[in-house]
């Protein structure tokens, strides 16, 4: 899966030179792509400030999610596939219900662009990081009956500042240990 400056995302196979699908519809660069856990869908984020959910089998856009005020740099699906988190230049994390296409939560706390999002294995924690040199952990296990997080302002569990290092990669291990990486300039 690749995103491109030509406003498309492309689905590739390792045994073909040509793309299997070209997903066109964004109005600007496609900066991030993420497969849904079931493998039948892919989400794309763009400088046009929208997230699109695509059906891989037929190449059709099935959802358009709008609400960001800047480019979208990162996407993360919850392990159960019911929610999608998106973030980017507007320093906010938006969480979406995939079934209804509704925004269920807005998480604020970063002071610069967010470049990394990852859910814990059980989906109860979302880790975020970016250019503000900080890793933040958010409680995402509190969805109410309407599928929304009751009190998003109380979701921030903790912040871990780095030593002047932007966070470019986060990963939860199988034992729920969080690994982070970024460039360090001494």
Regions found by a protein language model. Give the residues of each.
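WD40/WD-repeat beta-propeller blade N-cap
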Residues: 24-30, 66-72, 108-114, 153, ...
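A conserved positional marker within WD40/Gbeta-like beta-propeller blades
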Residues: 7-10, 19, 27, 41, ...
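Terminal intrinsically disordered, low-complexity extensions flanking WD-repeat/beta-propeller proteins
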Residues: 121, 140-186
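Conserved strand-to-loop turn within each blade of WD40 beta-propeller repeats
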Residues: 2-6, 44-48, 79, 86-90, ...
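Loop/turn segments within WD40 beta-propeller blades
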Residues: 33-40, 76-81, 118-123, 163, ...
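WD40-repeat beta-propellers
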Residues: 9-12, 33, 51-54, 75, ...
């Amino acid at each position: 899966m690749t995103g491109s400056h030509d406003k498309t995302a492309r689905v590739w196979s390792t045994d073909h030179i040509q793309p299997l699908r070209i997903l066109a519809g964004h109005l600007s660069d496609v900066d991030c792509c993420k497969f849904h856990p079931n493998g039948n869908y892919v989400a794309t984020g763009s400088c046009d400030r929208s997230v699109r959910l695509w059906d891989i089998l037929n190449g059709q856009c099935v959802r358009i999610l709008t609400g960001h005020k800047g480019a979208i740099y990162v996407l993360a699906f919850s392990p159960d596939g019911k929610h999608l988190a998106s973030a980017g230049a507007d320093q906010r994390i938006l969480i979406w219900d995939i079934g209804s296409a509704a925004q269920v939560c807005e998480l604020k706390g970063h002071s610069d662009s967010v470049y990394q999002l990852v859910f814990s294995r059980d989906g109860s924690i979302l880790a975020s990081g970016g250019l503000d040199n900080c890793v933040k952990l958010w409680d995402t296990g509190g969805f109410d009956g309407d599928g929304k997080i009751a009190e998003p302002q109380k979701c921030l569990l903790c912040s871990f500042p780095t030593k002047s290092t932007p966070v470019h990669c986060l990963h939860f291990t199988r034992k729920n240990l969080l690994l982070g990486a970024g460039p360090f300039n001494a």
